[in-house]
Amino acid sequence: MTTICTLLKDSQLPDSPSARLDTELLLAAAMGKPRSFLRTWPERIVPREANERFDDWIARRRNGEPVAYILGHQGFWSLDLEVAPHTLIPRPDTELLVETALATLAADTATVLDLGTGTGAIALALASERPLWTVTAVDRVEEAVALAERNRQRLLLENVEVRRSHWFSALDGRRFRMIVGNPPYIPASDPHLSEGDVRFEPKSALVAGSDGLDDIRQIVAQAPRHLLDEGWLLLEHGYDQGAAVRELLGARGFAGVHTLRDLGGNERITLGQWAC
């Protein structure tokens, strides 16, 4: 029989920068308890079934599999989302895109499009904050569409429509007050693709050509046909792509183009306004 304290001590993940947190999350979930339980009752015996479940999960984590995929869920904004290996894991940096969208569009009612929705994180976060907005969330991957719809239903967000579309392909000329997106933006040759958690994430949601801008170019080129007059386009991109994305938006005719930095000081979100 093993106590919580002993199991945490003996099951560290030396190769993970968040080793203690990862271990606690896995053990708490294996026991069906909140993390606070582990610290409140460190001498409690871990039940055999929970111990076996934890041993399996910790082995998967040592192999590099992300905690979110092991547990099947991830927190984003104020939401708890189901995740799966055919979608990206929502990241804290992307919350800046949600913050920017909410700050940019002050209207109580609006139509918003989320491109490449994945788990539905961005669309569902916006819809939860603005219940009178009508949000359309699209993804080209059928499994991602099904996952986003499950998250929508579980969160009871009736102001979101989830549908399958490769960017704008299935939108039939519909126009929106705002378009947001976190498209693939990693260059195909980036060595980080073979390192850490990202090894387990779908490359189709990460890689966009030799310079990482192929999908952003396509979105910028097509977005004006789907924006209302004075509508906004907001895009997340790589830390070193701000200047390139600003140039693309400016060349396409967007006004007020500017870039916001994330908490790490990196250029992360670029936006511009369309005027017919």
From Swiss-Prot:
SUPFAM superfamilies registered for this protein in UniProt: S-adenosyl-L-methionine-dependent methyltransferases
Binding site for substrate: N182, P183, P184, Y185
Catalytic EC class: transferase
Catalyzed reaction equations: L-glutaminyl-[peptide chain release factor] + S-adenosyl-L-methionine = N(5)-methyl-L-glutaminyl-[peptide chain release factor] + S-adenosyl-L-homocysteine + H(+)
InterPro entries the record matches: DNA_methylase_N6_adenine_CS, HemK-like, N5-glutamine_MTase, PrmC_N, RF_methyltr_PrmC, SAM-dependent_MTases_sf, Small_mtfrase_dom
Family of the protein in this entry: Belongs to the protein N5-glutamine methyltransferase family. PrmC subfamily.
Protein name: Release factor glutamine methyltransferase
Organism: Pseudomonas aeruginosa (strain ATCC 15692 / DSM 22644 / CIP 104116 / JCM 14847 / LMG 12228 / 1C / PRS 101 / PAO1)
Name of the gene this protein is made from: prmC
